[in-house]
């Protein structure tokens, strides 16, 4: 038997767990707790546990819906910054045991674990390091607090009743810490050791150099370019969001940037909020999964303990469109030729439908060209490229062209590819495509090239909002207010109420802004309204941003980015 030539690895490589998360693509966040009943985002630790009483709690519904709509893992918030715990912990009385829910005998973590085990849904744990309730959360008692946090980790991770059949795939350590909170030094290494002792296969999300990093914003959008590697010495609570968003082309540690965003404006459920539009979700998908990184979408349950019907419907619509994107790969089994290829790694591997096969060139050159013949003229507007990321991320520049009657025309160009790159362009008709690799850190390898036509609903969702949001000043100093103008361009013959809400970006609730909601009523013929948007002061020279979203009664939306500078 002929021995297949082995291609050398390059740079930091993903672990089996990181590679599995790349392949999962979609994860769900569940924010549910005492904040849900106070309709707030961040509690102060003084909320009354007796307010926690979800009368129709159904974790089977949560997991079933998420499973049916394409999510592969669920990260459940067991303790948020307020310190309220969703299981009866031995180390604090600020738990569900102090609530009227289940007559004080309930254990929400056990319930969602049973549901996850029943539906075989991977489960992750969010346990906030910042705890506004604990009297130990003070620099003078930080050793005792670190032990307290570690005890809770052990209590959860060692319990076979918790997790999907006792297993957690991800541990989430949020780096958020409110203005004025004590600046404790966390004993991360001791915590990490505890996690690996009980859940050795779990990936860890933290501000340190762990398997997962924050993507640098809460809008669910990865940077472009996006490198799934960093330099460990550059990671801390003070790491600039832009570094996290793009990664580091010279990175020495493989780090998956997790793109998190909420289905609604807030992380916890509020009656006054609505789910994002389908168009928004599709845009977020293309800017996260479409840039090679997992999307972590928060779906907050109601006070009753159910996923809201309107949210379920939006998830179903989202799943239907995403699934239909890949219904027909026009490049399946298409003929591919290349300027260079190795016998064991031919260009035909790009369209053979096999996950683990890939193309490799035969010689080191300054650029490489691959040409795809679809066999017939096809209409398409979405292209997919993949690298075999298990061998290391390599490509740093590419151009995609289509051949028209007058010659080759650029369809898209970019820098990084990574696990998966989706490139959405204008609808074109062509038989031949050409991929030119212009820059790479090592011998480039590619595992897939797909060609698709997006479903018609994606075009329908692009309808203009008929709203214009503008800001008096392009940038605001934190702590100052910004004057916002809202103009209505259509539907002027009718009265209309437009809702405006704040949404996170690189700046989050409690750092750059406090959540604000306006219900603005336009009279018939009225076209313009003015409002004042407040921001929060923060120290440092960095610039943060968040969004103001305006929603019409027919579901159309418009957004403006608010830039805030520190002082």
For the regions a language model picked out, list residue spans one by one.
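Mature catalytic domains of secreted/periplasmic carbohydrate-active enzymes
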Residues: 1-366, 371-373, 384-394, 401-402, ...
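Short, flexible loop/turn segments at beta-strand junctions in immunoglobulin-like
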Residues: 424-427, 535-537
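Structural beta-strand segments of beta-rich domains
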Residues: 368-370, 381, 480-484
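Short boundary segments that mark the start of a structured unit
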Residues: 460-567
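Short solvent-exposed strand-capping/beta-turn motif centered on an Asx-Ser/Thr pair
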Residues: 375-377, 388-390, 440, 489-493, ...
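Tryptophan-centered short beta-strand motifs
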Residues: 408-409, 559
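Extended extracellular/luminal ectodomain segments enriched in beta-structured repeat modules
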Residues: 366-367, 375-382, 430, 492
């Amino acid at each position: 038997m002929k021995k297949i030539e082995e291609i050398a690895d390059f740079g930091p490589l993903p672990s089996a767990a990181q590679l599995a998360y790349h392949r999962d693509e979609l994860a769900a966040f569940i924010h549910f707790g005492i904040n849900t009943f106070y309709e707030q985002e961040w509690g102060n630790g003084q909320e009354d546990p007796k307010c926690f009483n979800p009368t129709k709690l159904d974790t089977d519904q949560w997991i079933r819906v998420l499973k049916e709509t394409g999510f592969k893992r669920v990260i459940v918030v067991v303790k948020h910054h307020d310190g309220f715990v969703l299981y009866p912990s031995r180390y604090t009385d600020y738990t569900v045991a102090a609530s009227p829910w289940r007559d004080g005998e309930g254990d929400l973590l056990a319930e969602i674990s049973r549901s996850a085990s029943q539906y075989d849904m991977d489960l992750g744990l969010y346990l906030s390091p910042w705890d506004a309730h604990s009297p130990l959360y003070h620099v003078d008692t930080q050793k005792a607090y670190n032990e307290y946090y570690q005890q809770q980790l052990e209590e959860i991770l060692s319990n076979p009743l918790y997790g999907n059949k006792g297993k957690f795939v991800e541990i989430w350590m949020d780096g958020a810490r409110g203005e004025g909170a004590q600046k404790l030094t966390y004993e991360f290494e001791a915590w990490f050791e505890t996690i690996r002792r009980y859940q050795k296969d779990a990936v860890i999300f933290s501000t340190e150099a762990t398997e997962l990093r924050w993507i640098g914003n809460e809008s669910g959008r990865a940077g472009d370019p996006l490198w799934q590697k960093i330099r460990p010495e550059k990671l801390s609570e003070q790491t600039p969001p832009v570094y996290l968003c793009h990664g580091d082309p010279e990175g020495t540690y493989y780090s998956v940037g997790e793109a998190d965003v909420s289905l609604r404006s807030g992380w916890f459920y509020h009656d006054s909020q609505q789910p994002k539009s389908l168009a928004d979700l599709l845009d977020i998908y293309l800017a996260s999964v479409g840039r090679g990184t997992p999307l972590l979408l928060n779906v907050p349950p109601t006070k009753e303990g159910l996923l809201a019907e309107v949210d379920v419907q939006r998830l179903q619509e989202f799943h239907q469109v995403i699934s239909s994107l890949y219904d027909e790969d026009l490049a399946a089994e298409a003929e591919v030729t290349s300027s260079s290829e190795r016998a064991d790694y031919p260009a035909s591997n790009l369209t053979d439908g096999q996950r683990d096969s890939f193309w490799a060139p035969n010689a080191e050159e300054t650029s490489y060209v691959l040409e795809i013949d679809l066999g017939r003229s096809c209409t398409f507007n979405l292209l997919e490229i993949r690298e075999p990321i298990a061998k290391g991320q390599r490509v740093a520049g590419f151009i995609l062209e289509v051949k028209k009657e007058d010659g080759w025309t650029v369809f898209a160009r970019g820098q990084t590819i990574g696990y998966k790159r989706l490139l959405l362009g204008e609808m074109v008709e062509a038989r031949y495509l050409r991929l030119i690799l212009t820059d790479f850190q090592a011998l480039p390898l590619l595992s897939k090239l797909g060609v698709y036509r997006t479903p018609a609903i994606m075009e329908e969702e692009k309808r203009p909002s008929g709203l214009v949001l503008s800001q008096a000043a392009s940038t605001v100093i934190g702590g100052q207010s910004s004057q916002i103008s809202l103009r209505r361009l259509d539907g002027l013959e009718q009265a209309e109420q437009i809702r405006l809400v704040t949404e996170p970006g690189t700046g989050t609730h409690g750092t750059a802004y406090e959540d604000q909601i306006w219900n603005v009523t336009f009279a018939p013929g009225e076209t313009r309204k003015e409002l004042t948007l407040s921001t929060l002061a923060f120290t440092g020279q960095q610039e943060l941003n968040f969004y103001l979203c305006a929603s019409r009664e027919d579901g159309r939306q418009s957004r403006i980015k608010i830039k805030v500078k520190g002082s």
